[in-house]
């Protein structure tokens, strides 16, 4: 077990001033036991904590660091912006056009785009736009899918809500809950039933095409196509939440991978290169309803600020120019195969789901295709696995219901180290 004296001291101090001592619930280590680790520095595929311990990082700031931490091109670009341009103006800037052009070029569904400050803002704004354009009130989401902490989405949510065993949050009004309908992931019949029961009053269907906050659960292609067809028939806006899987599973996101185009797309994480950013975009006919062009209001003091846009533009250019996706696939497949071999040697049969460089090892033998199957996992067993990996210098998300992210800077030696650690951790978990 690494020495964590300073982390423990900081956590005690943090709890005096910050609710729970953290600024996002999943960071608190509640589902794995122990105290959270305070980090001091990130570099490439590694993080170093305040006690001087170094970890191989498979969280990647919860997804943004597909190119690793402190990428030299991104940090150099940020330094130029900071010293020669500034941090914010509250006016239009040329970089807003540059990133918009890149997003229109890269993402199949996007004809126009609006920058915001987070993935939550993006999903909230997209749903408001869908309601404004259709004149309808209700939305359909899917059990276990996480779309940020907007009130409409905290009904059988994933991510920290699932980790804490609290799928509904106090403070969400009954009216909001009544306008949010939950369907079962990968089950088109459950969606069709809700649409039939609420005929003419469904504004949008929002989905993570690769769910990343109930572990990792890919949608079946025929399911996404059925959603597309249903939305076309019923005049419903189809929203792909690609905050996590966008630019991760393919340059153009899951919609490129599946070949299915939504009406609106929400983005975040990778397009900020580690800085706070989000975006929503889609069909011109919908986006032209956003203020000031249309009547659907959305605004943000720091939206499109130079630092976030610099990191996003540079990240997208690197991904576009260098195409790391074949190599990311090779690396993630190596880990998947290594974990599978380890389980076979130990007589274990846990489930692995993976799409590109997003993966999850589920501590269940039930195939995981939905929220219901995900929650069959043995979370105590995962806790033992997590602790053993941490003891060996491998930093995973402190929750069974989060993704493991492989980055472009994980080396072959890093991957081999991870597979060896996995064998030991599986032994510890199965005791």
UniProtKB/Swiss-Prot annotation:
Annotated CDD domains: OAT_like
UniProt-listed HAMAP family: HemL_aminotrans_3 (MF_00375)
Protein name per the record: Glutamate-1-semialdehyde 2,1-aminomutase
Intracellular or extracellular location(s): Cytoplasm
PROSITE patterns: AA_TRANSFER_CLASS_3
Pathways per UniProt: Porphyrin-containing compound metabolism; protoporphyrin-IX biosynthesis; 5-aminolevulinate from L-glutamyl-tRNA(Glu): step 2/2; Porphyrin-containing compound metabolism; chlorophyll biosynthesis
EC number annotated for this UniProt entry: 5.4.3.8
Top-rank EC class of the record's enzyme: isomerase
GO biological process: chlorophyll biosynthetic process; protoporphyrinogen IX biosynthetic process
InterPro entries: 4pyrrol_synth_GluAld_NH2Trfase, Aminotrans_3, Aminotrans_3_PPA_site, PyrdxlP-dep_Trfase, PyrdxlP-dep_Trfase_major, PyrdxlP-dep_Trfase_small
Gene source species: Chlorobium phaeovibrioides (strain DSM 265 / 1930)
Record's catalysed reaction(s): (S)-4-amino-5-oxopentanoate = 5-aminolevulinate
């Amino acid at each position: 077990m690494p020495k964590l004296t300073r982390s423990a001291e900081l956590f005690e101090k943090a709890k005096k001033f910050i609710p729970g001592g953290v600024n996002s619930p999943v960071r608190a280590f509640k589902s794995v036991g122990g105290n959270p680790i305070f980090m001091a520095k990130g570099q490439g595929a590694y993080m170093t904590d305040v006690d001087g311990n170094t970890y191989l990082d498979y969280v990647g700031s919860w997804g943004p660091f597909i190119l690793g931490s402190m990428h030299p091109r991104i940090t150099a670009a940020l330094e130029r912006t900071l010293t020669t341009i500034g941090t914010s103006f509250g006016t239009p800037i040329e970089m807003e056009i540059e990133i918009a052009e890149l997003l229109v070029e890269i993402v199949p569904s996007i004809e126009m785009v609006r920058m915001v400050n987070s993935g939550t803002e993006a999903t909230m704004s997209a749903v408001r736009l869908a309601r404004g354009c259709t004149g309808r009130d209700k939305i359909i989401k899917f059990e276990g899918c996480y779309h940020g902490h907007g009130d409409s989405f905290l009904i059988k949510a994933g991510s920290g809500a699932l980790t804490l065993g609290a799928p509904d949050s106090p403070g969400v009004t009954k009216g909001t809950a009544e306008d949010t309908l939950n369907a079962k992931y990968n089950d088109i019949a459950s969606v069709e039933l809700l649409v039939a029961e609420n005929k003419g009053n469904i504004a949008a269907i929002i989905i993570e095409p690769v769910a990343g906050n109930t572990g990792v659960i890919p949608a079946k292609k025929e399911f996404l196509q059925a959603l597309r067809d249903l939305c076309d028939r019923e005049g419903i806006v189809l929203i792909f939440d690609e905050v996590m899987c966008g630019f991760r599973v393919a340059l153009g996101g899951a919609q490129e991978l599946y070949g299915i185009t939504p009406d609106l797309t929400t983005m975040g994480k990778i397009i900020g290169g580690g800085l706070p950013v989000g975006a929503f975009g889609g069909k011109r006919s919908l986006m032209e309803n956003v203020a000031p062009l249309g009547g659907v209001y959305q605004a943000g003091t720091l939206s499109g600020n130079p630092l976030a846009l610099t990191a996003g533009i540079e990240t997208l250019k690197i991904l576009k120019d260098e195409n790391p996706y074949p190599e990311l696939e090779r690396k993630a497949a190596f880990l998947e195969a290594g974990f599978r071999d380890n389980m076979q040697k130990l007589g274990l049969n846990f489930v692995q789901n993976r799409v590109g460089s997003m993966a999850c090892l589920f501590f269940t033998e039930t195939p995981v295709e939905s929220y219901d199957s995900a929650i069959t996992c043995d979370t105590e067993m995962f806790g033992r696995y997590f602790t053993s990996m941490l003891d060996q210098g491998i930093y995973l998300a402190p929750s069974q219901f989060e993704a493991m992210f492989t980055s472009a800077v994980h080396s072959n030696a890093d991957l081999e180290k991870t597979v060896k650690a996995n064998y030991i951790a599986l032994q510890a978990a199965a005791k």
